[in-house]
């Protein structure tokens, strides 16, 4: 072991056997990440819990009694944080976690294993919310990567655009959308879409996001409500 620049003991992973360099680097980073260690101590399922915590500590959009939807929720770090803040474990709000993957139970969280891209998903969600809309739709999804940077950026932006479209179908007027994005030149359409549908749109980089990552979050507040489709003029 050696100390890093902050004085903490640093664990070094020795390469051996058939471990790939990428796997070694990932494991080395995990073992030396203070947020990973803190998540274990605090009982969170992922370090991502601190990203949502930091964003909400600054902007205060999670409130007691809200209806919240967590897209791509597994393993559940964001759901854990949101459930505490809205009080859903004590019956003061409702949190619906959606993912294609299975997710272990979390107090105060209702899990739905489904594809939010399915055309029936918005109606299914509203049914789970008792016929009402959501106050907050949040997403920490990143999707699968190919290793080809431009392709991955387009895929990620496409996923967030789909999440934003889903949010526009289920949010109440005044609602909030928060989602992970990656800094690139491919998100102009997404930002235009959000600025059209929300009163305020901003980018946020919480301290828990690794400094060497292009990861950041888009926070859109004040949903304007679904705009009615323009009607064609009738012939006299």
UniProtKB/Swiss-Prot annotation:
Disulfide bonds: none annotated. Pfam families: FtsJ. The keyword Secreted does not apply. It is found in: Cytoplasm. Its EC number is 2.1.1.166. Its main location: cytoplasm. Coiled coil: none annotated. The active site is at residue 180. It is an enzyme of class 2 (transferase). GO terms for molecular function: rRNA (uridine-2'-O-)-methyltransferase activity. S-adenosyl-L-methionine binds at residues 76, 78, 99, 115, 140. InterPro entries: RNA_methyltr_RlmE (IPR050082), RNA_MeTrfase_FtsJ_dom (IPR002877), rRNA-MeTfrase_E (IPR015507), SAM-dependent_MTases_sf (IPR029063). One of its GO terms (cellular component) is cytoplasm. Keywords: Cytoplasm, Methyltransferase, rRNA processing, S-adenosyl-L-methionine, Transferase. It catalyses: uridine(2552) in 23S rRNA + S-adenosyl-L-methionine = 2'-O-methyluridine(2552) in 23S rRNA + S-adenosyl-L-homocysteine + H(+). Specifically methylates the uridine in position 2552 of 23S rRNA at the 2'-O position of the ribose in the fully assembled 50S ribosomal subunit. Belongs to the class I-like SAM-binding methyltransferase superfamily. RNA methyltransferase RlmE family. This is Ribosomal RNA large subunit methyltransferase E. It comes from Rhodopseudomonas palustris (strain HaA2).
């Amino acid at each position: 072991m050696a100390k890093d620049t902050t004085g903490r003991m640093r664990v070094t992973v020795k390469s051996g056997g058939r471990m790939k360099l990428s796997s070694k680097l990932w494991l080395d980073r995990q073992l030396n990440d203070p947020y990973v260690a803190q998540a274990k101590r605090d009982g969170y399922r992922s370090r991502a819990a601190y990203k949502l915590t930091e964003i909400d500590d600054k902007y205060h959009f999670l409130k007691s009694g809200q209806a919240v939807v967590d897209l791509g929720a597994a393993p559940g770090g964001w759901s854990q944080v949101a459930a505490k803040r809205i009080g859903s474990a004590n019956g003061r709000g409702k949190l619906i976690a959606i993912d294609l993957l299975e997710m272990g139970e979390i107090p105060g969280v209702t899990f739905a294993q489904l594809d939010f891209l399915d055309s029936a998903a918005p109606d299914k969600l509203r049914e789970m919310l008792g016929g009402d809309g959501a106050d907050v739709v949040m997403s920490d999804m990143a999707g699968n990567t190919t290793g080809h940077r431009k392709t991955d950026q387009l895929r990620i932006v496409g996923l967030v655009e789909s999440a934003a479209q889903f949010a526009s179908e289920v949010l109440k007027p005044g609602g909030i959308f928060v989602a992970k994005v990656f800094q690139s030149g491919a998100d102009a359409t997404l930002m235009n879409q959000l600025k059209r549908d929300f009163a305020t749109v901003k980018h946020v980089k919480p301290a828990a996001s690794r400094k060497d990552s292009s990861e950041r979050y888009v926070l859109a507040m004040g949903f304007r409500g679904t705009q009615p489709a323009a009607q064609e003029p009738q012939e006299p």
